[in-house]
Amino acid sequence: MYKILLSLWYVISFMPAQSIIGPGNTKLNLFNYLIENYKTNSTLSYNDARDVMYSIIDLGQDNTLKGIYTNYTITIDPSQDPRPQTNALNMNCEHSWPQSMGASGSPQKSDLHHLYPTRGNVNSSRGNKPFSEIDDNQTDRWWRLDYYSNSIPNQ
């Protein structure tokens, strides 16, 4: 058994963990190689990006869509256009990098790495404030699921 494990370790330890991209290229040549070989040819429109986010990326197996921050959850019909459904149920799109700070143009506005479903009024309330921990005594609103309160919640 020891010989088998030792042999297996030997084989695994010398397997390449990654492949080299653009071998022999450095600096500007490597940069140009990466653009030529990996740059996307198209960018989703903002509407299409939200459709993909709502109906593919963040849609649960039970057709539920859970928002960040509050876990507010809605159920949508995947055979229908998701945006009218999400709008009607107070779910919209959070930009983790705010549009007001440079993410308003293309392709930034529709970059799926920075888009998340969220409860609409929570997103509006948050605005473009920086992420941080706020002392309860300095907080004036608490959100959870579809609930809102102006007083400190009980633990």
Language-model regions: role of each:
Residues 64-86, 90, 119:
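Short cysteine-rich loop/turn motifs with clustered Cys
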Residues 9, 59-60, 85:
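A generic structural signal for short, solvent-exposed coil/turn residues
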Residues 1-20:
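Bacterial Sec-dependent N-terminal signal peptides
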